[in-house]
């Protein structure tokens, strides 16, 4: 009997790619999403998941639901017997979190507390949580390993991820029957090789690569580069970009780990290589054959100069390594953008 996995926020960018990998690995994903950051499409399914069904030839069970809706969550857990929960649902824009801290704390913290309480009540004590490298704050050393201090976060989004990590750690400490894998993502980019699913930000992209690809396709005039006076090789910010398919596969490895009764484990998911903004622009120009105009503007509050992972622990304990490099990330991102110039709203 295939094992059921609840995926919260599963219609979003990382969620939809993970649902695809779950199906390929033989799991039965049940997806909930409130469409805050997902495209509705015409049918009963979010467009991203409709396409996942097409790609895999398997059906996806989906319910429109907000994790703040306690009654709906209760009904869901009564209806299904879940082996584990992969928890993506949450607000995720750094800049917006500075403007709207209460929204971020309400959705991310209250939503997660409710989810954990309902999991506990139904005896579902296996969790994969999508955390973030933002929990490290300003790096004290590089590359960042899991032992690097956390909590010196520069914005409410990062703080909310840090607080949730602490809650889950405390829960696993108090009750040894809980197992949790906390995955600290670095900077996901790229898209599925088919070009059928990818990142489709609602509104102006907050992240570099979707913005760059929208400039390349002509949706936006020029890229703003936030600061070129950082202490890096070319003065622009350096980040660890990871292919979203590699990231999604990390969640399958995390589910396997849960079966070992692992307690609470924490892993970086990154490549271990940092690239600057200008290196990413050049790589995207190469992949797309387009010139990408940019202008340098003031630094963005809360941005750090450089941030990249030491991913060796995930390799040792999860058997997971990022396999897809920079050129592949950009080629796949460009294929998605070219086939879907308006994102999921593009009519075939």
From Swiss-Prot:
**Chain's role:** Catalyzes two distinct but analogous reactions: the reversible epimerization of UDP-glucose to UDP-galactose and the reversible epimerization of UDP-N-acetylglucosamine to UDP-N-acetylgalactosamine. The reaction with UDP-Gal plays a critical role in the Leloir pathway of galactose catabolism in which galactose is converted to the glycolytic intermediate glucose 6-phosphate. It contributes to the catabolism of dietary galactose and enables the endogenous biosynthesis of both UDP-Gal and UDP-GalNAc when exogenous sources are limited.
Q: Which EC number(s) does the record attach to this protein?
A: 5.1.3.2, 5.1.3.7
Q: What's a Pfam family this protein contains? A: GDP_Man_Dehyd
Pathway, according to UniProt?
Carbohydrate metabolism; galactose metabolism
Matching Gene3D superfamilies: NAD(P)-binding Rossmann-like Domain (3.40.50.720), UDP-galactose 4-epimerase, domain 1 (3.90.25.10)
Q: Which reaction does it catalyse?
A: UDP-alpha-D-glucose = UDP-alpha-D-galactose; UDP-N-acetyl-alpha-D-glucosamine = UDP-N-acetyl-alpha-D-galactosamine
This chain is encoded by the gene named GALE
Q: What is stated as this protein's family in its record? A: Belongs to the NAD(P)-dependent epimerase/dehydratase family.
Binding site residues for NAD(+): 12-14, 33-37, 66-67, 88, 92, 161, 185
Q: Subunit structure, briefly?
A: Homodimer.
User: What's the cofactor?
Assistant: NAD(+)
Q: Identify the InterPro entries for this entry.
A: NAD(P)-bd_dom, NAD(P)-bd_dom_sf, UDP_G4E
Q: Name one GO biological process term.
A: galactose catabolic process via UDP-galactose, Leloir pathway
Report the GO terms under cellular component. cytosol
Q: Highest taxon of the source?
A: Eukaryota
CDD domains, per this entry?
Answer: UDP_G4E_1_SDR_e
Key words, A-Z: Carbohydrate metabolism, Galactose metabolism, Isomerase, NAD
Annotated substrate binding sites: 132-134, 185-187, 206-208, 224-226, 239, 300-303
Organism, per UniProt?
Pongo abelii (Sumatran orangutan)
Give an example GO molecular function.
UDP-glucose 4-epimerase activity
Q: Supply the name of the protein.
A: UDP-glucose 4-epimerase
Q: Where are the active-site residues found?
A: 157
Asked whether the UniProt record includes Isomerase among its keywords, one would answer: yes
